[in-house]
From Swiss-Prot:
It comes from Yersinia pseudotuberculosis serotype O:1b (strain IP 31758). It comes from the Bacteria. Pathway: Carbohydrate metabolism; pentose and glucuronate interconversion. Gene3D superfamilies: Divalent-metal-dependent TIM barrel enzymes. Keywords: Iron, Lyase, Manganese. Catalyzes the dehydration of D-mannonate. The lineage of its organism: Bacteria, Pseudomonadati, Pseudomonadota, Gammaproteobacteria, Enterobacterales. GO terms for biological process: D-glucuronate catabolic process. The gene is uxuA. InterPro entries: Man_deHydtase, Xyl_isomerase-like_sf. This is Mannonate dehydratase. The keyword Manganese applies. Its EC number is 4.2.1.8.
Length: 397
């Protein structure tokens, strides 16, 4: 596996020097300063590559080229935004980058309710609390029809949760959900968010799939022409939220994506922390079934709680993800590829990390502090080395 590290650009508190010292050789980044839907100029891409090269690092994976909401809703200027996306892909390929991660989540990217959940050892993790989210939907956002998405017990718990909240608590929860987490290119006020939700009225799972299929049929031929590996990121959490459909959550969704545009360039980001939230997602089976389409991996683990829809992010080698078996399955796929002459290792990044040690006293991007990810990378690296020595002695290091 190629060891990579996500970097949010010059404003990221984690520097390129930090990344280099962590042992990563590749950087996963994007041009976050360019608005959604605007073409990425070759000059801007090359400038970012030069910044990385100055520190002996390479831009391994683009994460992400955001998809404009008009494309997801198949409305407004969707055709122009698709053409812009196609040109951005051509420009990325012209600069020698071969992998692009993206997602098709409506409105919000990844979602959490608590960005500072304290663990027993004093470190802090990200958490999704189903009852807190219900309190937001039912009593803060007041989304019509939201009660249909929660059990009677959850609704009672959500009301009690809301009644115990202060104004500061309400503002914090609202901000955590709709203000935009790292990697999300858009944040909203409550009124803006309600208006955006209204744009999805009448768009169910079948319609969103149709809209994504239209996008893929326009994008994948370009990826084939220029040699790009497109790697769709799963929904996080992997289920419908806010009355919005989600269509990249299960192995059945992966099969649909493969069949919709059956090309090796139409692939996946295997995010174990996203898919792994669902107990019915067999991560190893997913890797074994779609191994040739897995172009990028995000390795982390989560811990499901008493309410199975509530979870927090665990240590990389703890929680509900069997990281040993996951890494072994990835290495098995790498060995298969190398036997066929494809020597490109699968890029991997330690996804998220606990805020811990000195980082507890610093301003950090939620989930993306340095020391927690350093720990995660070191742990995964150790698993990989042990597996290679034991089972894959001929696998190119």
């Amino acid at each position: 596996m190629e060891q990579t590290w996500r970097w949010y650009g010059p404003n990221d508190p984690v520097s390129l020097d930090d990344i280099r010292q962590a042992g990563a050789t590749g950087v996963v980044t994007a041009l976050h300063h360019i608005p959604n839907g605007v073409v990425w100029p070759v000059s801007e891409i090359k400038q970012r590559q030069a910044e990385l090269a100055a520190k002996n690092l390479v831009w391994s994976v683009v994460e992400s080229v955001p998809i404009h909401e008009d494309i997801k809703t198949h409305s407004g200027n969707y055709q122009q935004y698709i053409e812009n996306y196609q040109q951005t892909l051509r420009n990325i390929a012209e600069c020698g980058i071969d992998t692009v991660c993206y997602n098709f989540m409506p409105i919000l990217d990844w979602t959490r309710t608590d960005l500072e959940y304290e663990l027993p050892d004093g470190s802090k993790a990200l958490r999704f609390d189903q009852i807190a989210f219900a309190a937001f939907e039912l009593h803060i956002l007041k989304r019509p029809g939201a009660s249909n998405d929660y059990t009677a017990e959850e609704q009672v718990q959500a009301e009690a949760y809301f009644n115990a909240m202060t104004e500061a608590d309400i503002a914090k929860l609202t901000g955590n959900i709709i203000a935009g987490l790292p990697g999300a290119e858009e944040g909203y006020t409550l009124d803006q968010f309600r208006a955006r939700l209204a744009e999805y009225d009448g768009i169910d799972k079948a319609q969103l799939r149709e809209n994504m299929a239209y996008f893929l049929r326009a994008i994948i031929p370009v990826a084939e022409q220029v040699g790009l590996r497109m790697a769709v990121h799963p929904d996080d959490p992997p289920r419908p939220i806010l009355g919005l459909p989600r269509i990249v959550s299960t192995i059945e969704d992966m099969q649909w994506l493969k069949e919709t545009v059956d090309s090796i360039h139409n692939g996946f980001t295997m995010c174990t922390g996203s898919y792994g939230v669902r107990a019915d997602n067999d991560l190893v089976k997913m890797i074994e079934t779609f191994g040739d389409r897995i172009h990028f991996t995000h390795l982390r683990s989560t811990c499901r709680e008493g309410n199975p829809k509530t979870f927090h992010e665990g240590g990389h080698l703890q929680g509900d993800v069997d990281m040993y078996s996951v890494v072994k399955a990835i290495l098995t796929e790498e060995q298969r590829r190398q036997s066929l002459g494809d020597m490109r290792p699968i890029p991997m990044r330690p996804d998220h990390g606990h805020q811990m040690l000195d980082d507890l006293h610093k301003k950090t991007n939620p989930g993306y502090s340095a020391i927690g990810r350093l720990k995660g990378l070191a742990e995964v690296r150790g698993v990989e080395l042990a597996l290679k020595r034991t089972f894959f002695p001929d696998l190119k290091q």
